[in-house]
From Swiss-Prot:
Annotated family: Belongs to the mycobacterial PE family. PGRS subfamily.
GO CC annotations on file: cell surface; extracellular region; host cell cytosol
Phylogenetic placement of the source organism: Bacteria, Bacillati, Actinomycetota, Actinomycetes, Mycobacteriales
InterPro entries: PE-PGRS_N, PGRS_rpt
Encoding gene (name): PE_PGRS47
Pfam families: PE, PGRS
Phenotype upon gene inactivation: Deletion mutant is attenuated in vitro and in vivo, and shows enhanced MHC class II-restricted antigen presentation during in vivo infection of mice. Also shows a reduced capability to inhibit autophagy and an increased acidification and lysosomal fusion of phagosomes during infection of phagocytic cells.
Keyword Secreted included in the entry's annotation: yes
Role played: Contributes to evasion of both innate and adaptive immunity. Inhibits autophagy in infected host phagocytes and inhibits major histocompatibility complex (MHC) class II antigen presentation by mycobacteria-infected dendritic cells. Has an important role in the growth and survival of M.tuberculosis, particularly during intracellular growth and in the later chronic phase of infection.
Keyword terms, alphabetized: Host cytoplasm, Secreted, Virulence
Localization: Secreted; Cell surface; Host cytoplasm, Host cytosol
Superkingdom of origin: Bacteria
The protein's name in its UniProt record: PE-PGRS family protein PE_PGRS47
Region Disordered, annotated ranges: 506-525
Amino acid sequence: MSFVIAAPEFLTAAAMDLASIGSTVSAASAAASAPTVAILAAGADEVSIAVAALFGMHGQAYQALSVQASAFHQQFVQALTAGAYSYASAEAAAVTPLQQLVDVINAPFRSALGRPLIGNGANGKPGTGQDGGAGGLLYGSGGNGGSGLAGSGQKGGNGGAAGLFGNGGAGGAGASNQAGNGGAGGNGGAGGLIWGTAGTGGNGGFTTFLDAAGGAGGAGGAGGLFGAGGAGGVGGAALGGGAQAAGGNGGAGGVGGLFGAGGAGGAGGFSDTGGTGGAGGAGGLFGPGGGSGGVGGFGDTGGTGGDGGSGGLFGVGGAGGHGGFGSAAGGDGGAGGAGGTVFGSGGAGGAGGVATVAGHGGHGGNAGLLYGTGGAGGAGGFGGFGGDGGDGGIGGLVGSGGAGGSGGTGTLSGGRGGAGGNAGTFYGSGGAGGAGGESDNGDGGNGGVGGKAGLVGEGGNGGDGGATIAGKGGSGGNGGNAWLTGQGGNGGNAAFGKAGTGSVGVGGAGGLLEGQNGENGLLPS
């Protein structure tokens, strides 16, 4: 049995290239014939005549050899062309009986269930919004959804679901619209029950109509046993302007399969008011974690970032999406997803968007019940007025709290640092408070307070105040208290400013049974 794999189209292309090369060589040989076969003697003497005759004999021998080589080349090209034709004919002959066999197998399943046993689902036609066909029950990927009709605001078709093995189809894109809202994207199809990737959600359509909204992105499909959830689609842009114009929200990420991760949320669409980022999909029961939230859309007012997905039973929470940039106001960051129900760390909060009035950072996600660290708070955005940092998440029964996010830098005022998350009940240290944001012409931001410790553990340190040039310096945050055994957190340092110096943070109390109080923060020297 031969294990050679042939591609007829490549063989045909190679034969054409060889034929072209042969034609070029033949033309060159013909052009060289006249000056090399009949060479005139340089003089009438015997030596010149003999030399001319010798070179002429060489030219004649080359021409004879060239004729033989041309014949061999032509035979080789003919053989290669015939081989390509034979392979193509064999493939065409094999397709018909195989397809007939598949049709016979699929017929009873189509009749009873409206779905084949083997084979991919049909794609929806572009411009129709048709749903993609479902893949074969045993094996086959779902078809992609068709896009909406351009200019109509029609929703995109949903992607088809896969069978036991196969990938879910992607959702179709929503249609644009000049007289209303953009069309929503289609949802992604579910991945194969045993194995396969879930389909992504379709992107929302844009609009140019006054005070209209872009289409929402489609949700990602759900994963199978071992598959991750599909990513959500991007929200459509709203380009018509107006007070009510808003970008489409990003699609939610798909839920992960039993052992799969959640899908990422889609980004919000651009507009005067940016769309909200899609939420990350929840992780499967035994999956690695939830999906990250989508970024908020850009605009005069940035969109809020999507929240991260939860982590199933034992996974990590997904990170919150960053807030969208804005010329006037930035979007707030999304909250981090909660850790797994049993154990798992919380996801980090998303950063606030940059703007004149910057967005606040998202709060960190709480850890799982038994064990895990709380997620860190997101940093506040920077701009004219810096955004506040997000608070850290709470730790599990055994686990430390998450750190607070730093306040954003602002030319007119710095943002406040986020509070550190409290530790779990039994064991763990409190999270550190975030530092206050710096400023040039306004007050510096105050530092965040440190989180409280568990029964055994240390309190979190307070964040330092933000420095400034013209305004008042930020105050340091207080340190977190210990509980039974452990040292209290140190207070944050005060910052200097031309209009005054902030207060120092007070150290947290030490443990009731053992542990020293935290030290107070320092004044600037």
